[in-house]
Curated annotation (Swiss-Prot):
GO molecular function terms noted in the UniProt entry: glutamyl-tRNA reductase activity; NADP binding
Binding site for NADP(+): 181-186
Region (Disordered): 407-427
Species per Swiss-Prot/TrEMBL record: Stenotrophomonas maltophilia (strain K279a)
Protein name per Swiss-Prot or TrEMBL: Glutamyl-tRNA reductase
EC number: 1.2.1.70
Native organism taxonomy: Bacteria, Pseudomonadati, Pseudomonadota, Gammaproteobacteria, Lysobacterales
Note: During catalysis, the active site Cys acts as a nucleophile attacking the alpha-carbonyl group of tRNA-bound glutamate with the formation of a thioester intermediate between enzyme and glutamate, and the concomitant release of tRNA(Glu). The thioester intermediate is finally reduced by direct hydride transfer from NADPH, to form the product GSA.
Domain observations: Possesses an unusual extended V-shaped dimeric structure with each monomer consisting of three distinct domains arranged along a curved 'spinal' alpha-helix. The N-terminal catalytic domain specifically recognizes the glutamate moiety of the substrate. The second domain is the NADPH-binding domain, and the third C-terminal domain is responsible for dimerization.
Length: 427
């Protein structure tokens, strides 16, 4: 059976198709149950995130994976990618390391890969091949991230803003943070904030339901945007990224908030284009305003560093893919070797016991030894002899060449005359 990966991601499919192919909540255990009931798929791990859905499987053909995904999510032809064996291994190593992510080197994907592996194991979908692959994946990803700077320093304006806030305030766990908006940028900021500790998280948005959804994921308090003015003074740090065409935070709002705070400093990050916070806010004492342009300059240096580190990580992955495939091939060859040795040992034990009985019954030793040697020869050579005869009839030259390598001609050896009972040795 072959190792396959079939999937789509942010590079190959728009968000509406990724949503259709996503497996979250109750849909995930149903999907895993369906995979378990698919006889053509021997092992499977289903990785589903907001940016990708990928099915890693051991199966005879990719058609089984394609049919299963089509039944679950409809026609996705033209948006899917498919890799087999070594390229499937390489793809998984790159995904887990963050080299295939929307944000190069982002660390969250490794945890998501581990969750997918753990969930597949809990649903009885893991066998030896996928389990070994994923265990090796975790090791490779850890090494690539440790030995290179591929995950170092923020490369999005949201993560850079959070890092700057953490540096400005020695302890965010003693601070109140206000998020204005509920889109992708604010989601990313909330995710980075939740990795640390924040004393209090407020989330204001024009659509309250979206703020409530974000607050439930990150332990915050949702507010309607109409209450922004009333709560602004509570915030030590403000991140704003709405889709508004005009500023939502004005100079007078911040001046009022500072008075209510007795001019305790406020850190404000305007992550929106067009801007959410009036530029004049930056002229206020104790208000420290950073815009997208301010953050972008720092982020670009970090991105350049990650791209250079990514090349180093790719080299590590190339080496580890080769080693993993070599190990797998060696392991695959062990099974027939074990079978061959077991067959030889069983034959030896059986015929040796027969010889002992013949000696005990008084048969001459020379005759017993001759029968033992003849029996071993017949029994051990019968399977390859039968296979070679079949190969000759079918024109299988590969097997014939393999036999020539396994049983090279012995110089000076003359075949004995064939006895009638040697013509077709039986097991």
């Amino acid at each position: 059976m072959t190792l396959w990966v079939l999937g789509l991601n942010h590079q190959t499919a728009p968000v509406e198709l990724r949503e259709r192919a996503a497996f979250a909540g109750e849909a995930l255990p149903r999907a895993l149950g369906s995979l378990r009931d698919t006889p053509q798929i021997a092992e499977a791990v289903l990785l589903s995130t907001c940016n990708r859905t990928e099915l890693y499987a051991v199966a005879d053909s990719a058609q089984a994976l394609d049919q299963w995904l089509h039944a679950q999510a409809g026609d996705l032809q033209g948006y899917l990618y498919q890799h087999a064996d070594a390229e499937a291994v390489r793809h998984l190593f790159r995904v887990a390391t963050g080299l295939d992510s929307m944000v190069l080197g982002e660390p969250q994907i490794l945890g998501q890969v581990k969750d997918a592996w753990s969930t597949a194991r809990d649903h009885g979908l893991l066998g030896q091949r996928l389990d070994r692959l994923f265990q090796q994946t975790f090791s490779v990803a850890k090494r690539a991230r440790t030995d290179t700077q591929v995950g170092a320093n923020p490369v999005s304006v949201a993560s850079a803003a959070v890092r700057l806030a953490q540096n400005a305030f020695a302890r965010l766990d003693d601070s109140t943070v206000l998020l204005v908006g509920a889109g992708e940028t604010i989601e990313l900021a909330a995710r980075h904030l939740s990795e640390g500790k924040v004393r209090r998280l407020l989330i204001a948005n024009r659509t309250l339901a979206h703020a409530q959804e974000l607050a439930s994921r990150h332990g915050g308090v949702a507010l309607p945007l109409t209450e922004l003015d009333r709560h602004l003074g509570e915030a030590d740090v403000v991140f704003s990224a709405t889709a508004a065409r005009e500023p939502v935070i004005h100079r007078e709002m911040v001046a009022k908030a500072l008075r209510a705070r007795r001019h305790k400093p406020m850190l404000l990050f305007d992550l929106a284009v067009p801007r959410d916070i009036e530029a004049e806010v930056g002229t206020l004492n104790d208000a420290f305003l950073y815009t997208v342009d301010d953050l972008e300059r720092a982020v670009e240096d970090n991105r350049r560093g990650r791209r250079e580190a990514a090349a180093e990580a790719e080299a590590i992955i190339d080496l580890q893919v080769s080693r993993f495939i070599e190990t797998q091939q060696a392991s695959a060859h062990q099974a027939p070797l074990r079978q061959l040795r077991a067959f030889g040992e069983a034959t030896r034990t059986e015929l040796l016991e027969r010889a002992r009985q013949q000696l005990a019954n008084g048969k001459p030793a020379d005759e017993v030894l001759e029968l033992l040697a003849h029996g071993l020869t017949n029994r051990l050579l019968h399977p390859p002899t039968a296979a070679l005869r079949a190969a000759a009839l079918s024109g299988d030259a590969d097997l014939t060449r393999a036999a020539e390598r396994l049983f090279p001609a012995t110089p000076g050896y003359r075949h004995p005359p064939v006895r009638p009972d040697d013509a077709d040795p039986a097991p």
